[in-house]
Amino acid sequence: MPGIKEIRTKIKSVQNTRKITKAMEMVAASKMRKAQERMRAGRPYATKVREIAAHLMQANPEYSHPYLVEREVKAVGVVLVTTDKGLCGGLNTNISRVTLSKLKEFEQRSIKVQATAFGNKGLGLLTRIGAKLVSQEVQLGDKPDLDRLLGAIKVQLDDYLEGRIDALYVATTRFVNTMKQEPVFLRLLPLSNGLDDPFQSGVETLAKTAEIKSDYSWDYIYEPDAKSVIDDLLQRYVEGLLYQAVAENMASEQSARMVAMKSASDNAKKVIGDLQLVYNKTRQAAITKEISEIVGGAAAV
């Protein structure tokens, strides 16, 4: 059995660790609220862009944008969104497992893959497995910069438009609620019919799917023309979805970190209680031994 001094040192060490995890829990809780606000802030914008784009395409059926055209898949692009830091439970492990499974599936189907990494953890994974990296962006901070994100993803979008890849996927963690985050592997391009939102999940949706009516009795006046407007809207819509993928991951990261740090703090409290019990028993045993020695010495006299 360890001595009293050793136990006291262990208790002090665990107490110090608990202070750190408790502080990290509080910081993560604060960042989580801000991340959730940013995640939800883009929903009204995405809703309106989708509704207008759906209206334009319905009113101009003769024009088919490349983002909407299905084609034989021979090569794909994958955007992997992870965190820059750890200490967020199994968040990165779960999305990495899903991504590796999909990459293996593409390999079995002889489909070429080129990847973009957002976050140090994803970059490390793709580097280890020898994936073809065409762009990367790390150290995004707590508030993602749209220009940096679009700069990294532009090469994938250009390759899609020029036919070098036939589909674009994003692997990210979808925020469901504070206690639940879901790893998802979603196809962004080509866009699905009706411009469905790939981040829909029960009541936690980016926005409701726009209802496309076939009996429009009115239309917009387009400047300079409908084709240019559709091109710009769909480009912005796809960019918005990619931004949303990063925002969802950041909200999930802070939620997972808060839960992980709370669990660590609770476990530390339990360990302190167990160590305190051992300390008390050891101390009591030492006192009892000393009393026995005194009594034994007195009896001998």
From Swiss-Prot:
Keyword annotations: ATP synthesis, Cell inner membrane, Cell membrane, CF(1), Hydrogen ion transport, Ion transport, Membrane, Transport
SUPFAM superfamilies registered for this protein in UniProt: ATP synthase (F1-ATPase), gamma subunit
GO BP terms: proton motive force-driven plasma membrane ATP synthesis
Entries under InterPro entries matching the protein: ATP_synth_F1_ATPase_gsu, ATP_synth_F1_gsu, ATP_synth_F1_gsu_CS
GO cellular component terms given for this protein: plasma membrane; proton-transporting ATP synthase complex
Main localization category: membrane
Example of a GO MF term: proton-transporting ATP synthase activity, rotational mechanism
A family per Pfam: ATP-synt
Membrane topology: Peripheral membrane protein
Summary of subunit composition and partner proteins: F-type ATPases have 2 components, CF(1) - the catalytic core - and CF(0) - the membrane proton channel. CF(1) has five subunits: alpha(3), beta(3), gamma(1), delta(1), epsilon(1). CF(0) has three main subunits: a, b and c.
Function field: Produces ATP from ADP in the presence of a proton gradient across the membrane. The gamma chain is believed to be important in regulating ATPase activity and the flow of protons through the CF(0) complex.
The protein, known as: ATP synthase gamma chain
